[in-house]
């Protein structure tokens, strides 16, 4: 079986593709799996896919710039034509039995050409609000899988052939297999350590980073607290300089990195998580049952991260801190309250797992893809 995975831009599109690929490889060790992403250096696929050991092909495509009247958007029609040609060459050479797109601008040309050539083509949309690539491809794709039931309504219903289904978000195997005690032992954490895990997205988030620098400096005064923060590659050098100018810079319990590559271990070991409220982050928190302080990105379409965060808040499964309040010290205040209340952390962890976890998502996605191949 030959499978071509495509999706990218941010880790939120790449990681679902990696999780689906890992599930297929687990069931079919001899499966040949390759990826297609954009040629942009900032595309996280160019980092994460080779690390996972898969061949990676690239096409010359990028997302639409904001504002819409930006002169750089004049190049998009040319790039759309060029990338479709490049995708066609990749498909012709690889000859896939199945193409799976996980959203982001990078998946459009490959999925579009796969559909045109009659290759079974499936899409997965992790967010409640579907992105432009999925919106453009939904009517032609053979299968559209979603994480939220409401996404099907936003896509116009189940489609003419009932080809839209809810399956949940796929998770990397580590999120399902690693226990808290095993992860903490692996990371050298004791029972007395209170581990705070913090990240603002694969590319970084300036205001979140600034707030965590202040938080880390404060937490140096709490002896049993350990913090790991991923600042993102784009903002890392600036934050490293700020970090080193505070008490956090000389405190071994406060750690700063650009990106977390062993997220399943870190998430499993955490007592408290600080993160954005993207769909994949919420799914990871739910599957591992973690208390979380969510800082929704205000820069996404229709405030979908705020909606994700408030869904958790309304169930008592999370705390929301809006980005515009960060300069007021709201993050430090909320974290301090949760550190002081293990009971509240425990309740939040139980509720997010009970209300939002979808532990069989990988199996449902795999079964759906195999049914698609057999039906064609």
Positions of PLM-derived features:
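C-terminal alpha-helical cap of glycosyltransferases
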Residues: 358-376
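Glycosyltransferases and closely related glycan-assembly transferases
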Residues: 86-100, 108-122, 135-139
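Conserved nucleotide-sugar phosphate-binding/catalytic loop shared by glycosyltransferases and other
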Residues: 3-8, 27-79, 167-169, 233-235, ...
């Amino acid at each position: 079986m030959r499978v071509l995975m495509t999706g990218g831009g941010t880790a939120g599109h790449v990681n679902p593709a990696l999780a689906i690929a890992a599930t297929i490889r687990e069931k079919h060790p001899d499966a040949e799996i390759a990826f297609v992403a954009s040629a942009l250096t900032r595309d996280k696929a160019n980092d994460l896919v080779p690390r996972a050991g898969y061949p990676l092909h690239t096409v010359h495509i990028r997302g639409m710039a904001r504002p819409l009247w930006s002169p750089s958007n004049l190049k998009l029609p040319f790039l759309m034509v060029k990338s479709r040609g490049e995708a066609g060459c990749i498909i012709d050479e690889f000859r896939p039995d199945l193409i799976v797109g996980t959203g982001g601008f990078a998946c459009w040309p490959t999925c579009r050409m796969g559909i045109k050539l009659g290759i079974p083509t499936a899409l997965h949309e992790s967010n409640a609000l579907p992105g432009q690539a999925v919106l453009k491809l939904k009517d032609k794709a053979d299968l559209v899988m979603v994480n939220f039931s409401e996404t099907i309504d936003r896509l116009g219903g189940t489609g003419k052939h009932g080809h839209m289904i809810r399956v949940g978000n796929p998770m990397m195997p580590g999120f399902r297999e690693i226990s808290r005690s095993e992860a903490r032992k692996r990371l050298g954490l004791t029972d007395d350590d209170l581990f705070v895990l913090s990240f603002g997205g694969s590319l970084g988030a300036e205001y979140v980073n600034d707030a965590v620098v202040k938080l880390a400096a404060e937490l140096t005064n709490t002896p049993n607290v350990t913090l790991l923060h991923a600042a993102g590659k784009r903002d890392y050098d600036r934050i490293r300089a700020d970090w080193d100018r505070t008490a956090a810079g000389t405190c071994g319990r406060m750690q700063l990195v650009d990106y977390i590559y062993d997220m399943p271990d870190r998430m499993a070991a955490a007592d408290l998580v600080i993160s954005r409220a993207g769909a994949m982050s919420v799914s990871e928190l739910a599957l591992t049952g973690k208390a979380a302080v969510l800082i929704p990105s205000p820069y996404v379409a229709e405030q979908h991260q705020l909606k994700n965060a408030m869904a958790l808040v309304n169930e008592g499964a999370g705390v929301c801190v809006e980005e515009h309040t960060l300069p007021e010290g709201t993050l430090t205040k909320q974290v301090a309250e949760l550190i002081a209340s293990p009971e509240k952390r425990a309740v939040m962890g139980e509720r997010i797992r009970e209300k939002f976890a979808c532990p069989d998502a990988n199996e449902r996605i795999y079964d759906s893809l195999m049914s698609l191949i057999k039906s064609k």
